[in-house]
Amino acid sequence: MATPVVLPDGKKVAIDLLSADLPDVHVMGRLPEGAALNAALPVVRVLRIGGVADVRGWADPANRDNPRFSIDCYAAAEDQAMRLAQRVCAAWELLKGRDTADGIVTGISQETGPQDRPEDPNADMARVGMTLGMSVSPPRSTS
């Protein structure tokens, strides 16, 4: 009987690597509520919005996941949110080949570039977002 391949949590890989590349930014999967969000700015939120596993052989299990993410960049002003989004895109371009304890990035994609995603007009922040993708495989074996 074949041993199933447990694919890495691509969202965790993305958050961990972006956090390392953007040490002055709070990178997370869930936003704090109310005033706590304003206090945490600048913030990058990573939401998995889809993607499927692939690279199946004739009788082999999947060994790569291809998550797609909606990435939202929050800052105090529109120009700051756009600049943060550009920094995220620049960091994303360099993720291929990097790894964490959870997995290795084997490919990246940018499906939409930074775009305005207006918040409530009464909010004291701006949001710019984009759709990014990656391919992740289980960590390399050290044995």
Please place each PLM-identified region on the residue numbering:
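Short, hydrophobic/π-rich interface segment
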Residues: M82-K96
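Small/polar-rich, solvent-exposed N-terminal microdomains that initiate assembly or binding
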Residues: M1-A59, T100-A101, T142-S143
